[in-house]
A protein has these predicted regions:
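A generic "folded-domain core" signal
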Residues: 1-188
């Protein structure tokens, strides 16, 4: 597999050519349509951004409503609420919620989301492995900015790269030629 792409039980990791890594965790073999996404750009001081997505069940009493509060629980302790802003975009977690979840996911943890009468679970299986791989890809292992294997090493971490710019090339004297079946050029 490509160095920056991996699947770790219920978590996926994708790192792109700018050095940004995204890891997403899903429900554990149940049909709960929920995921948490953590995104971190390259660079020593880059923070981790957390987002929450709950897809519709198609059942009015179980679907999260726009404007409804979703409470996040880690090992039975409330991390506070997130307001569901839109069905078309993920809901942003606070910095405190993100840090608490990342810390909890380093070991076995239970993550639950509650709203109305509905409780959804996000799996912890594979999260620590995905975080370790993210640290490795971004060259953070044993540095203070590592998520998993923190240390005091001062080596440079992966610097953010600019997205490659693609220039469209103009073609001069364009002529359109229709090739018909049976013509010599058609068979090339």
């Amino acid at each position: 597999s490509i160095k920056g792409i991996g699947n770790y039980q219920d978590w996926d990791l994708v790192c792109d050519n700018t050095g940004t890594c995204r890891m997403a965790g899903y429900q554990d073999e149940s049909s709960d349509p929920v995921s948490i996404l953590f995104t971190r750009a390259a660079g020593e001081n880059a923070t981790v951004e957390g987002k929450l997505t709950i897809l519709p069940f198609g059942e009015a009493d179980r679907d999260v409503q726009v404007g409804q509060d979703i409470e996040i629980w880690l090992n039975g302790k409330s991390l506070g609420k997130v307001k569901h802003i839109s069905d078309d975009a993920p809901d942003k977690l606070t910095e405190e919620q993100t840090k608490a979840l990342l810390s909890g996911l380093k070991k076995e943890s239970e993550i639950r989301l509650t709203y109305g009468k509905t409780t959804l679970k996000v799996s912890d299986k594979g999260a620590a492995a995905a975080m370790l791989k993210m640290d490795e890809f971004q060259q953070r292992l044993n540095t203070p900015s590592a998520l998993i294997r923190q240390g005091q090493e001062k080596h440079a971490v992966l610097a953010p790269k600019v997205k490659p710019k693609i220039d469209a090339v103009s073609v001069n004297n364009r002529k359109t030629i229709e090739l018909k079946h049976g013509e010599k050029q058609f068979n090339h």
